[in-house]
Amino acid sequence: MVSIKSVLAAATAVSSALAAPFDFVPRDNSTALQARQVTPNAEGWHNGYFYSWWSDGGGQVQYTNLEGSRYQVRWRNTGNFVGGKGWNPGTGRTINYGGYFNPQGNGYLAVYGWTRNPLVEYYVIESYGTYNPGSQAQYKGTFYTDGDQYDIFVSTRYNQPSIDGTRTFQQYWSIRKNKRVGGSVNMQNHFNAWQQHGMPLGQHYYQIVATEGYQSSGESDIYVQTH
């Protein structure tokens, strides 16, 4: 999948509201993003959880913050998008998550975040659709945590959108061998494994359990929590 960047320095408004492509009504009208063909880019806090949402505007994609730590994404013939709920800043916390993830084509379900100094975009891939992102990245090693094997990869993005504008930066990947949609992710174990393979992190920005898609359709309904 083409990497999908979160350009999230500020919420970006869509010029006009359009009819919702899905029969999909926000559960919390005071805080949920309005139903539109493409949900406007945004980040902030909702019911005590940090959320982040970005789309390139292609296709039809709807992100909605639901009650508590839940969110939902529905997409059809979309371009690039990534979004979800979690925390800011990121830490080595153990994350519990669950729900539903059904991509028809390219899609990821991942713990997703960024650091600065160095600028790093990272993924712990728990499930994916038709494309394994490790196929175009450099393999660094394998380790075992949370009941399964994870393969570690690194890749470099040149002059691409980031949380700090257009920059060159590295992407770190842990990809679970056996896909799942629900369980615990010990982020400190991933951070330690990356460090052991010469992949240092910097100052943490946000850390979310994200749904990501590229030129695909599908839906997800995910909740997050910590121990």
Curated annotation (Swiss-Prot):
The entry annotates sugar attachment on N29
Look up the record and name the pathway of this protein: Glycan degradation; xylan degradation
Q: Which reaction does it catalyse?
A: Endohydrolysis of (1->4)-beta-D-xylosidic linkages in xylans
InterPro entries xref list? ConA-like_dom_sf, GH11/12, GH11_AS_1, GH11_AS_2, GH11_dom, Glyco_hydro_11
Q: What is its EC number?
A: 3.2.1.8
Q: Say which domain of life the source belongs to.
A: Eukaryota
Name all GH11 domain ranges. Answer: 37-225
Q: Could you tell me where this protein is found in the cell?
A: Secreted
- Which Pfam families has this protein been placed in? Glyco_hydro_11
Q: Which GO terms describe its cellular component?
A: extracellular region
Q: What class of enzyme is it?
A: hydrolase
Instruction: Mention one GO biological process in which this protein takes part, according to its record.
Output: xylan catabolic process
Identify the keywords attached in UniProt to this record, alphabetized.
Answer: Carbohydrate metabolism, Glycoprotein, Glycosidase, Hydrolase, Polysaccharide degradation, Secreted, Signal, Xylan degradation
GO molecular function list: endo-1,4-beta-xylanase activity
Record flagged with keyword Lipid biosynthesis: no
Q: Where is the active site?
A: E121, E212
Signal sequence region: 1-36
Q: Identify the PANTHER family for this entry.
A: ENDO-1,4-BETA-XYLANASE A-RELATED
Which family is it part of?
Belongs to the glycosyl hydrolase 11 (cellulase G) family.
Q: What does this protein do?
A: Endo-1,4-beta-xylanase involved in the hydrolysis of xylan, a major structural heterogeneous polysaccharide found in plant biomass representing the second most abundant polysaccharide in the biosphere, after cellulose.
What protein name applies here? Endo-1,4-beta-xylanase 2
Q: What's the name of its gene?
A: xyn2
